[in-house]
Swiss-Prot record:
UniProt catalytic activity: GTP + H2O = GDP + phosphate + H(+)
Domain of life: Archaea
Name of protein: Signal recognition particle 54 kDa protein
Protein species of origin: Halorubrum lacusprofundi (strain ATCC 49239 / DSM 5036 / JCM 8891 / ACAM 34)
Domain notes: Composed of three domains: the N-terminal N domain, which is responsible for interactions with the ribosome, the central G domain, which binds GTP, and the C-terminal M domain, which binds the RNA and the signal sequence of the RNC.
GO cellular component: signal recognition particle
Length: 464
């Protein structure tokens, strides 16, 4: 994920305080220099870096740590609070009737972002509509229409009309029944006069409740001037940062937020319409520092389970705690997990599993794990209902047949069966447990004992 390098660097800096109970001035000087290097490497504006590091230094030297608090935890708390202050509050987006205007350069991800936002509002119970006004870029209409079809939201565009202002007006009329209108505009490769003039005309025509600037996370220092120009022409109330699943540095986008005196509204975390997060500053910085984000995790779990149950109304996840745990249950679990997004993003949300633990894993650990899950899914697709319901009937001849049918090998089939057996044993231990017992079991699983999340990452035979 974007800013991963920044997170790794910050965590590495803080680890140097491990074992210290008190901080000397030289300790603070060294940690502040490390933080400055980390932020500058991530393309955060120099003035912001100095402001942030000065605040951290002052607080670290002047504030007395609470009793029993280590130097590392004390500085971690200060860094967390100051970085939350740096990124600011989330953009206010009431769940009510509104018109949102999107601005940004070509390639920033506006069209994809429009469909993602519409999908997000639809999941909140509103009826959104996307109005595509980009007459400059070939294929913009087709892309927007396809993305909105995937998001299952209303769409308006007119490929035969070359007047973006007229399209915007007609779009508002044609989608009058919608609660939320998201107006996508054309971009250019640079901040050209005709781009600014066009978006100012559209802004006057649609009279948006708020205008959002869409920024590619890789933009770097160029974000500052871009943000300033759009702020001057239409006023920017919030920012959507796109392509956060890439390896970009991301600091430029944070600089743009500060430059426009606005805030971050959404994060784009992948290529599908579901890969969007409402920005929550505390959770975002918490993940960056390896502290997890349980709120975002619970939202993803809830959404994934609901979608899985929509497709299979007979399945209730709670049934696994009541009776047998079959391969069908395991397959449904894996499907729900896939719906939660890339595995590395999910792991970052789990306290104790992201951050430092992820830093210790090989770079390809997530890819290897997801590849293994895909092979397991192919194997289960090659099984009969009887085999999925009663894995113990799978003997040597069936193993050979399943391996051939799935394009895998017999060893991988046996690994799947072993994995199922391990998970079955773990789940059976939950049956009849009270809440306190379950919490202790989850902690044990997280440490890599008994087929839990720790094992998933290579702590043992582990799931997947």
């Amino acid at each position: 994920m974007v800013l991963d390098d920044l997170g790794t660097s910050l965590r590495s800096s803080l680890d140097k305080l491990q074992g210290k109970s008190r901080l000397s001035e030289s300790d603070v000087e060294e940690i502040v220099k490390e933080i400055q290097r980390s932020l500058l490497s991530a393309d955060v504006d120099v003035s912001l870096v100095m402001e942030l590091s000065d605040s951290i230094k002052t607080r670290a030297l002047e504030e007395e740590p609470p009793g029993g608090t280590t130097a590392k935890d004390h500085v971690l708390k200060i860094v967390y609070e100051e970085m939350v202050e740096l990124v600011g509050d989330s953009t206010e987006l009431p769940l009510e009737n509104q018109t949102i205007l999107l601005a940004g350069l070509q390639g920033s991800g506006k069209t994809t972002s429009a469909a993602k936002m519409a999908w997000w509002f639809s999941k909140k119970g509103l009826r959104p509509a996307v109005i595509q006004t980009d007459t400059f870029r070939p294929g913009a209409y087709d892309q927007a229409k396809q993305m909105c079809e995937r998001a299952e939201v209303d769409f308006y565009g007119d490929p035969d009309n070359d007047d973006p202002v007229a399209i915007a007006r007609e779009g508002l009329e044609a989608t009058a029944d919608a609660d939320v209108h998201i107006v996508d505009t054309a971009g250019r490769h640079a901040l050209e006069d005709d781009l600014i003039a066009e978006i100012e005309e559209i802004e006057r025509a649609v009279d948006p409740d708020r205008s959002l600037l869409v920024l590619d996370a890789a933009i770097g220092q160029g974000a500052k001037e871009q943000a300033r120009q759009f702020e001057k022409s239409i006023g920017i109330e919030g920012v959507m940062i796109t392509k956060l699943d890439g390896t970009a540095k991301g600091g430029g986008a944070l600089t743009a937020v500060n430059e426009t005196d606005s805030s971050i509204a959404f994060l784009g975390t992948g290529e599908t319409v579901q890969d969007i997060e409402r920005f929550e500053p505390s959770g975002f910085i918490s993940r960056l520092l390896g502290m997890g984000d349980l709120k975002q995790l619970s939202e993803r779990v809830e959404r994934a389970m609901a979608e899985a149950q929509e497709e299979d109304e007979d399945w209730d996840p709670e049934d696994m705690l009541q009776g047998e745990f079959t391969l069908k249950d395991m397959k449904r679990q894996m499907d729900a997990m896939n719906r939660m997004g890339p595995l590395d993003q999910v792991m970052d949300m789990i306290p104790g599993m992201g951050g430092g633990m992820m830093d210790q894993l090989p770079d390809d650990a997530m890819d290897v794990t997801q590849d293994r899950m895909r092979r397991f899914e192919r194997i289960m697709d090659s099984m009969t209902d009887e085999e999925l319901e009663q894995p113990r009937v799978v003997g040597q001849s069936r193993t050979e047949r399943i391996a051939r049918g799935s394009g895998t090998d017999e060893e991988t089939v046996r690994q799947l069966l072993e994995q199922h057996s391990m998970m079955e044993q773990t789940i059976s231990q939950f049956q009849g447990m009270g809440e306190g017992d379950m919490q202790r079991m989850m902690k044990k699983m997280g440490g890599g004992e008994g087929g839990g999340l720790g094992d998933m990452m290579g702590g043992g035979k582990g799931p997947f």
